[in-house]
A protein has these predicted regions:
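Conserved catalytic or regulatory cores that recognize and/or transform ribose-phosphate-containing ligands
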Residues: 1-153
């Protein structure tokens, strides 16, 4: 599957090991992951972009999200840009897994309930299982249950 991964560029130095752990896990499961815009960019390089380059960068991000089957966002560090990307993915009807490793879940995301938005606290030990469960869910491999009513005559 095609995965769009995002996280805070400004907190990349602190969270790069987590970003890499998530991306490496997805790649090991043979998923195609778009992530280089996060791991190869710096806050300074983004800030130095002129308007034309920022718009082109934003257009690329939109196309990557459109092409993805789902999104994974590492949100341990608050980021307006990541929130925007999540909102865009949801608007495009993409399933989104929001991961955070410390503290409380992102408050604005937990306020709303969407069947395509899943928020999970993770550790290095359980992140793979969380990702697998999410992928099984969006592939439709989760349990389907029905309630049948029988009328007596």
């Amino acid at each position: 599957m095609k995965v769009y991964f995002t996280g805070s560029i400004s907190a990349k130095e602190a969270y790069l090991p987590q970003y890499n752990r998530i991306v490496d896990y997805l790649k090991a499961k043979n998923h195609t992951v778009t992530y280089e815009h996060i791991t190869n960019s710096t806050e300074e390089s983004v800030r130095k972009m002129d308007k034309a380059h920022r718009l082109a960068f934003h257009h690329k991000i939109e196309n990557w999200i459109k092409a993805a089957d789902f999104m994974i966002a590492e949100t341990s560090f608050p980021s307006v840009s990541v929130g925007y990307e999540i909102a865009l993915a949801l608007r495009l009807a993409k399933p989104v897994l929001v991961l955070y490793s410390e503290g409380d879940p992102p408050s604005l995301l937990t306020y709303h309930s969407y069947d395509r938005l899943h928020t999970e606290k993770y550790t290095s030990d359980n992140v793979g299982g969380i990702i697998d469960d999410f992928i099984h869910y969006i592939e439709g491999k989760h349990d389907t249950r029905f309630t049948f009513f029988f009328l007596r005559k």
